[in-house]
Every structure is written in C-alpha cells, then in structure tokens.
Curated annotation (Swiss-Prot):
SUPFAM superfamilies named in the record: Carbohydrate phosphatase
Highest taxon of source: Bacteria
Gene from which the chain derives: suhB
Protein name in UniProt: Nus factor SuhB
InterPro entries reported in the protein's UniProt record: IMPase, Inositol_monophosphatase-like
Family: Belongs to the inositol monophosphatase superfamily.
Reaction(s) the record says it catalyses: a myo-inositol phosphate + H2O = myo-inositol + phosphate
Primary location: cytoplasm
Function summary: Part of the processive rRNA transcription and antitermination complex (rrnTAC). The complex forms an RNA-chaperone ring around the RNA exit tunnel of RNA polymerase (RNAP). It supports rapid transcription and antitermination of rRNA operons, cotranscriptional rRNA folding, and annealing of distal rRNA regions to allow correct ribosome biogenesis. This subunit may play a central role in organizing the structure.
GO terms assigned for molecular function: inositol monophosphate 1-phosphatase activity; RNA binding
One cellular-component annotation, GO: cytoplasm
Amino acid sequence: MHPILNIAIRVARKCGNILIQYYDRNKTNNEKQILKKDFITKIIFVLEKTMIDMIHKSYPEHSIITYHKNNKIFKNTEIIWLINALDGIKNFENNLPHFCISIAIIVRKTTQISVIYDPIRNELFTSVKGQGSQLNGYRMRCKSTNTLKRSLVGLVYPCNNSKFQNYFFTIINLLFSHEVKLRCTGCISLDCAYVAMGRLDYLFNGNLIPLLFSSGSLQIKESGGLISDLNGGHDYVSSGIILIGNPKLMRVILVKIRELFQNNLK
C-alpha cells in the first residue's frame, strides 16, 4: 500500500470513530438550535485538529487545507492535503445517517490519492492515480448503463449558481421524461463514490465547490467514469456545473442536452 494512503486511511478511520461517538450524542441532544450549532462547531474543531496532528506526526513537511475552518497550513507546496472533516454536515446535524470524511492529497498540482470514509456503514472508498478505485479493498467500476430510462440519478441543486438555475428545471423535466429516479443525498463525496461503485448511474451537480470535489473526482476517474460540463468539455471548475457518469451514458445525456438547448449553452 502507498505509505501516504496508509496514513490517510488511519486518519479517516480515527476521525470516523470520533464522529460516531458525537453522532450518538447528537441523537439525544434536544438543545436549542444555537446550542446545537455550538455543538457542531466543537465537533469540527476536534476533527480537524485530530486530522492535522495525525498528518503532521507522519509528514510534518506536508501542507494542509481544511474545508470548514479554511485553515491553510503551508509548508511544502509539492504535497497538499485537502481535508473535509465532515461532508454532509446538515445531515449530521439533523441526525440523518449519511455523511463522511473526505481526504484528497495533491502532489504537484495533481490529485494522486483519495480517501472517502462513511463511518455509519464502515465503507472505505480509496483511489490512487493510475491504480484504480476500491471499496473496502475490492475494485470498483462504474455501471455500464447506456440509457437514461429508469436510471438512478444523483442531484445537487444549484443554490449558489443563479446562471445555471435557468437550465436546471428544463433538464430535470428531460430526466423525468425518461422515468429516471432522482436522489438528493446532501453529501457530494458519497455521491461521487456511489457513481464510482455503481450505486448511482449518473450525477448531475449544479453547485460545484472544488475543494469538496477533489477527492470524489479521482474516485470517478479511476473507476472508469467521465466528468464534464454541459457542453461536454472540461470547464466545470469555472462554470460550477458537472455531469458525471460512465462514457456511454455521458454521450447519451450530452446529446440530449444539446438538442434540448439547441447548442445555446454558454
């Protein structure tokens, strides 16, 4: 096993155990909302400190960027850890058992290692660039679905993307016309992992946050999936819109989207 991957897995599992303990306490926490917010803030602080301490114990020269507190610890720009201590925070806050810990390791500006850990289901998704994606040690591949009809589609609403909202419901109607089943899970990292291992056929994300997506994107690519914007290009980081699926299904969807908007997408 890659030595950095081994440390990333240890970090994810350790924080997963902490999350479970807090989750059990949160289920019996009936305090007022403001006190609950303080409780969540404390959890994030504990998790991020644990992750940073564990990483720097093994790799003191590595840089770290955290999502929730936006901590940026720059020591070595060659290797950067992007850590999201709790992806699916709203689910956690409302006792919905669908959240995870997400880690991406960037080496010379390229994502080389990804770890996504779901402590509720004890599912560990790992990827190493050029070596594939795995779930609990078993190889993952995207589904080979080549039709939209009755497919299962993950969906992220474009709440911060007013430009895309003009297209959103039109595309949703297109999906409904093919009898697709939509799932809005509230956890983008697990959405990506689920496409990578075939639980979801396709993911339609109109609210891309690059720091949240780095780990999931490697899982997708290493399981044979494709990522594109609405035009079939790779401008999804600047546009904030991503389409994810296997190559056959992606071709079908992109053709239908082009027909729908008559090549007027910008």
